[in-house]
Amino acid sequence: MEWSPVAKVYDPLKAGSIDGTDVEPHDAGVWRAMLARYKPNRGVCGDPDLTLFVARLNPQTTEEKLRDVFSKFGDIRRLRLVRDVVTGFSKRYAFIEYKEERSLKRAWRDANKLILDQYELLVDVEQERTLPGWRPRRLGGGQGGQKESGQLRFGGRDRPFRKPINLSTRRPAEPRGRETERERDRRDYRDRRHERTHTEDRTHRHTY
């Protein structure tokens, strides 16, 4: 399979690994995500292929401010700032659905790491309905995260996979007891150098 810095299918075990090569989970969250069964929320409206995920918002940022900023990239069909159902406080992330794909692509390209109300935004495509096998953060999955949490997840825009070291690309080892071409070259060079030095010494002795 061709290597990619972003996941095409969500695998909790790979998401917990910086290069996607772990064979055992390294934290309890990965275990929880591997055992979890998750189905996308059917109550979510809109076209997932035209929807952006906007995270790391200032808790004070409002729907109106988001609409004002993101409408500069194109016409918005829907905007939902996710809030706590009890307190009404912002959960610091939102979903924005555009009317056209070119608007989504423009916002995806230009709005990521944009500073809004003194906070740097993370902007990516929606994953819940577009990435097969998706597990949300509350089940131990998700993507990104902060080092302090101890549960970093890789394979997304925020923390893409690092390309693993491919040991198969190394030169095959020569069989033991067999002189390599490089070793022969070195030996020949030493022999020639020794012979030349020995000849020069004899010449000097004869000269005197």
UniProtKB/Swiss-Prot annotation:
Principal location listed in the UniProt entry: nucleus
Identification of the protein by name: U11/U12 small nuclear ribonucleoprotein 35 kDa protein
Keyword Protein biosynthesis found: no
Domain RRM: 50-128
Annotated stretches, region: Disordered: 133-208
UniProt source species: Danio rerio
Record InterPro entries: Nucleotide-bd_a/b_plait_sf, RBD_domain_sf, RRM_dom, snRNP35_RRM, U1_U11-U12_snRNP_70-35kDa
Subcellular location: Nucleus
